[in-house]
Protein backbone atom coordinates (compact mmCIF):
# COMPACT_ATOMS: atom_id res chain seq x y z
CA UNK A 1 0.00 0.00 0.00
CA UNK A 2 1.44 3.35 -1.07
CA UNK A 3 1.43 5.86 1.77
CA UNK A 4 0.16 9.38 1.09
CA UNK A 5 -0.10 11.31 4.35
CA UNK A 6 -1.94 9.70 7.22
CA UNK A 7 -4.04 6.71 6.16
CA UNK A 8 -7.60 6.34 7.43
CA UNK A 9 -9.01 2.91 8.29
CA UNK A 10 -12.66 2.81 9.34
CA UNK A 11 -13.35 -0.26 11.47
CA UNK A 12 -16.37 -2.02 10.04
CA UNK A 13 -17.12 -3.36 13.53
CA UNK A 14 -18.89 -0.05 14.17
CA UNK A 15 -21.29 -0.47 11.24
CA UNK A 16 -24.81 -1.87 11.20
CA UNK A 17 -24.00 -5.57 11.07
CA UNK A 18 -27.09 -6.23 8.96
CA UNK A 19 -25.67 -4.01 6.21
CA UNK A 20 -21.96 -4.80 6.01
CA UNK A 21 -21.88 -4.77 2.21
CA UNK A 22 -23.36 -1.28 2.12
CA UNK A 23 -20.96 -0.19 4.86
CA UNK A 24 -17.96 -1.43 2.88
CA UNK A 25 -19.12 0.43 -0.22
CA UNK A 26 -19.73 3.61 1.79
CA UNK A 27 -16.23 3.39 3.25
CA UNK A 28 -14.75 3.06 -0.23
CA UNK A 29 -16.77 6.02 -1.54
CA UNK A 30 -15.68 8.16 1.43
CA UNK A 31 -12.06 8.23 0.30
CA UNK A 32 -10.80 6.14 3.22
CA UNK A 33 -7.68 4.11 2.46
CA UNK A 34 -8.52 0.70 3.87
CA UNK A 35 -11.08 -1.27 5.87
CA UNK A 36 -10.14 -2.54 9.32
CA UNK A 37 -11.83 -5.83 10.26
CA UNK A 38 -11.78 -6.80 13.94
CA UNK A 39 -11.84 -10.57 14.44
CA UNK A 40 -12.61 -11.57 18.05
CA UNK A 41 -12.93 -15.07 19.48
CA UNK A 42 -14.66 -14.46 22.83
CA UNK A 43 -11.54 -15.65 24.66
CA UNK A 44 -8.72 -13.19 24.05
CA UNK A 45 -11.36 -10.47 24.38
CA UNK A 46 -14.89 -10.93 25.80
CA UNK A 47 -16.61 -10.33 22.49
CA UNK A 48 -17.24 -12.30 19.30
CA UNK A 49 -17.32 -10.68 15.87
CA UNK A 50 -16.35 -11.80 12.38
CA UNK A 51 -14.86 -14.91 10.81
CA UNK A 52 -13.47 -15.79 7.37
CA UNK A 53 -16.96 -15.99 5.82
CA UNK A 54 -17.76 -12.39 6.73
CA UNK A 55 -14.32 -11.24 5.54
CA UNK A 56 -15.01 -12.90 2.18
CA UNK A 57 -18.39 -11.18 1.95
CA UNK A 58 -16.83 -7.79 2.68
CA UNK A 59 -14.15 -8.51 0.09
CA UNK A 60 -16.82 -9.11 -2.54
CA UNK A 61 -18.33 -5.69 -1.76
CA UNK A 62 -15.22 -3.53 -2.16
CA UNK A 63 -11.85 -3.19 -3.85
CA UNK A 64 -10.30 -1.53 -0.80
CA UNK A 65 -7.32 -2.99 1.04
CA UNK A 66 -8.60 -5.26 3.84
CA UNK A 67 -6.79 -5.42 7.15
CA UNK A 68 -7.66 -8.20 9.60
CA UNK A 69 -6.95 -7.41 13.26
CA UNK A 70 -6.91 -10.85 14.87
CA UNK A 71 -7.83 -10.47 18.54
CA UNK A 72 -7.75 -14.23 18.97
CA UNK A 73 -5.72 -16.98 20.54
CA UNK A 74 -3.98 -19.44 18.19
CA UNK A 75 -3.96 -17.04 15.22
CA UNK A 76 -1.66 -19.38 13.29
CA UNK A 77 -4.61 -21.72 12.71
CA UNK A 78 -6.60 -19.04 10.89
CA UNK A 79 -3.98 -17.33 8.72
CA UNK A 80 -4.68 -19.39 5.60
CA UNK A 81 -8.45 -18.93 5.97
CA UNK A 82 -8.07 -15.17 6.35
CA UNK A 83 -5.85 -15.00 3.27
CA UNK A 84 -8.28 -17.07 1.19
CA UNK A 85 -11.11 -14.80 2.36
CA UNK A 86 -9.33 -11.76 0.94
CA UNK A 87 -7.21 -10.29 3.74
CA UNK A 88 -4.39 -8.06 2.49
CA UNK A 89 -2.81 -7.70 5.92
CA UNK A 90 -3.10 -9.75 9.10
CA UNK A 91 -2.24 -8.27 12.49
CA UNK A 92 -1.78 -10.59 15.47
CA UNK A 93 -1.60 -9.63 19.12
CA UNK A 94 1.66 -9.84 21.00
CA UNK A 95 -0.25 -10.96 24.09
CA UNK A 96 -2.15 -13.75 22.33
CA UNK A 97 0.43 -15.49 20.17
CA UNK A 98 3.35 -17.76 20.86
CA UNK A 99 6.24 -17.97 18.39
CA UNK A 100 5.49 -14.53 16.99
CA UNK A 101 8.41 -14.54 14.59
CA UNK A 102 7.22 -17.79 13.04
CA UNK A 103 3.67 -16.48 12.68
CA UNK A 104 4.80 -13.23 11.06
CA UNK A 105 7.04 -15.13 8.66
CA UNK A 106 4.19 -17.49 7.77
CA UNK A 107 1.78 -14.61 7.13
CA UNK A 108 4.25 -13.04 4.72
CA UNK A 109 4.92 -16.37 3.01
CA UNK A 110 1.17 -16.54 2.37
CA UNK A 111 1.56 -13.40 0.27
CA UNK A 112 0.06 -10.75 2.55
CA UNK A 113 1.39 -8.12 4.93
CA UNK A 114 1.99 -8.86 8.62
CA UNK A 115 1.78 -6.82 11.79
CA UNK A 116 1.80 -6.98 15.57
CA UNK A 117 -0.71 -5.28 17.89
CA UNK A 118 0.05 -4.23 21.45
CA UNK A 119 -2.61 -3.73 24.13
CA UNK A 120 -2.34 -0.55 26.24
CA UNK A 121 -0.80 -2.25 29.27
CA UNK A 122 1.93 -4.07 27.30
CA UNK A 123 5.48 -2.71 27.39
CA UNK A 124 6.96 -1.81 24.02
CA UNK A 125 10.53 -1.34 25.24
CA UNK A 126 11.62 -4.31 23.11
CA UNK A 127 9.89 -3.12 19.93
CA UNK A 128 13.10 -2.85 17.91
CA UNK A 129 13.35 -6.65 17.74
CA UNK A 130 10.02 -6.86 15.89
CA UNK A 131 10.08 -3.84 13.58
CA UNK A 132 12.12 -5.61 10.84
CA UNK A 133 9.55 -8.44 10.82
CA UNK A 134 6.48 -6.23 10.43
CA UNK A 135 4.75 -4.09 7.85
CA UNK A 136 2.84 -2.36 10.64
CA UNK A 137 2.98 -1.92 14.41
CA UNK A 138 -0.51 -1.39 15.85
CA UNK A 139 -0.83 0.43 19.16
CA UNK A 140 -4.17 -0.04 20.91
CA UNK A 141 -5.30 3.31 22.30
CA UNK A 142 -8.26 1.69 24.09
CA UNK A 143 -8.74 -1.70 25.70
CA UNK A 144 -9.34 -4.24 22.93
CA UNK A 145 -12.79 -5.70 22.44
CA UNK A 146 -15.41 -2.95 22.27
CA UNK A 147 -16.23 0.26 20.40
CA UNK A 148 -16.94 3.62 21.96
CA UNK A 149 -14.09 3.90 24.47
CA UNK A 150 -12.05 7.01 25.30
CA UNK A 151 -8.58 7.49 23.85
CA UNK A 152 -5.75 6.65 26.28
CA UNK A 153 -3.39 9.69 26.32
CA UNK A 154 -0.28 7.62 27.09
CA UNK A 155 -0.52 6.29 23.53
CA UNK A 156 1.05 9.50 22.21
CA UNK A 157 4.36 8.84 23.92
CA UNK A 158 4.29 5.27 22.62
CA UNK A 159 3.89 6.56 19.07
CA UNK A 160 6.94 8.78 19.51
CA UNK A 161 8.93 5.86 20.95
CA UNK A 162 8.08 3.54 18.04
CA UNK A 163 8.76 6.30 15.49
CA UNK A 164 12.22 6.82 16.95
CA UNK A 165 12.90 3.08 16.88
CA UNK A 166 11.83 2.86 13.23
CA UNK A 167 14.08 5.77 12.32
CA UNK A 168 17.03 4.29 14.19
CA UNK A 169 16.63 1.01 12.30
CA UNK A 170 16.29 2.76 8.95
CA UNK A 171 12.81 1.29 8.41
CA UNK A 172 10.94 4.49 7.54
CA UNK A 173 8.24 3.64 5.04
CA UNK A 174 8.61 -0.12 5.36
CA UNK A 175 7.06 -0.39 8.84
CA UNK A 176 4.07 1.83 9.58
CA UNK A 177 2.61 2.91 12.92
CA UNK A 178 -1.11 2.32 13.35
CA UNK A 179 -3.27 3.62 16.21
CA UNK A 180 -6.58 1.94 17.00
CA UNK A 181 -9.33 3.22 19.29
CA UNK A 182 -10.91 6.40 20.60
CA UNK A 183 -9.98 8.33 17.46
CA UNK A 184 -11.71 11.66 16.85
CA UNK A 185 -10.48 15.01 15.50
CA UNK A 186 -8.57 15.88 18.68
CA UNK A 187 -6.85 12.54 19.22
CA UNK A 188 -6.18 12.21 15.48
CA UNK A 189 -4.30 15.50 15.49
CA UNK A 190 -2.16 14.40 18.44
CA UNK A 191 -1.44 11.05 16.78
CA UNK A 192 -0.45 12.67 13.48
CA UNK A 193 1.88 15.08 15.22
CA UNK A 194 3.50 12.22 17.17
CA UNK A 195 4.20 10.27 13.97
CA UNK A 196 1.29 7.88 13.37
CA UNK A 197 0.78 6.60 9.82
CA UNK A 198 -2.65 4.92 10.08
CA UNK A 199 -5.66 5.83 12.22
CA UNK A 200 -8.43 3.33 12.96
CA UNK A 201 -11.87 4.53 14.07
CA UNK A 202 -15.21 2.77 14.47
CA UNK A 203 -17.73 4.78 16.49
CA UNK A 204 -16.49 8.06 15.03
CA UNK A 205 -17.47 6.99 11.52
CA UNK A 206 -20.71 5.17 12.19
CA UNK A 207 -22.40 7.28 14.86
CA UNK A 208 -25.40 9.21 13.60
CA UNK A 209 -24.66 12.92 13.27
CA UNK A 210 -24.69 15.68 10.66
CA UNK A 211 -21.19 15.01 9.28
CA UNK A 212 -20.94 12.57 6.40
CA UNK A 213 -18.24 9.93 6.19
CA UNK A 214 -16.24 11.69 3.49
CA UNK A 215 -16.00 14.82 5.64
CA UNK A 216 -14.96 12.70 8.62
CA UNK A 217 -12.11 11.15 6.64
CA UNK A 218 -10.87 14.65 5.78
CA UNK A 219 -11.17 15.78 9.40
CA UNK A 220 -9.06 12.87 10.65
CA UNK A 221 -6.48 13.56 7.96
CA UNK A 222 -6.37 17.19 9.09
CA UNK A 223 -7.01 18.44 5.58
CA UNK A 224 -9.93 20.66 6.55
CA UNK A 225 -7.69 22.83 8.69
CA UNK A 226 -4.41 22.56 6.82
CA UNK A 227 -2.96 20.48 9.62
CA UNK A 228 -0.10 18.04 9.35
UniProtKB/Swiss-Prot annotation:
EC numbers for this chain: 5.1.3.1
Protein name in UniProt: Ribulose-phosphate 3-epimerase
Cofactor binding mode and count: Binds 1 divalent metal cation per subunit.
Taxonomy of the source species: Bacteria, Pseudomonadati, Chlamydiota, Chlamydiia, Chlamydiales
Binding residues annotated for a divalent metal cation, in chain numbering: 36, 38, 69, 180
Xref: CDD domains: RPE
Pfam families hit by this protein: Ribul_P_3_epim
SUPFAM superfamilies attached to this UniProt entry: Ribulose-phoshate binding barrel (SSF51366)
Catalytic activity, as annotated: D-ribulose 5-phosphate = D-xylulose 5-phosphate
Cofactors required: a divalent metal cation
A biological-process GO annotation: pentose catabolic process
Catalytic residues in the record: 38, 180
Family: Belongs to the ribulose-phosphate 3-epimerase family.
General function of this protein: Catalyzes the reversible epimerization of D-ribulose 5-phosphate to D-xylulose 5-phosphate.
Annotated pathway: Carbohydrate degradation
Entries under Gene3D superfamilies matching the protein: Aldolase class I
One annotated GO molecular function: metal ion binding
Binding-site residues, substrate: 11, 69, 145-148, 180-182, 202-203
Keywords associated with the record: Carbohydrate metabolism, Isomerase, Metal-binding
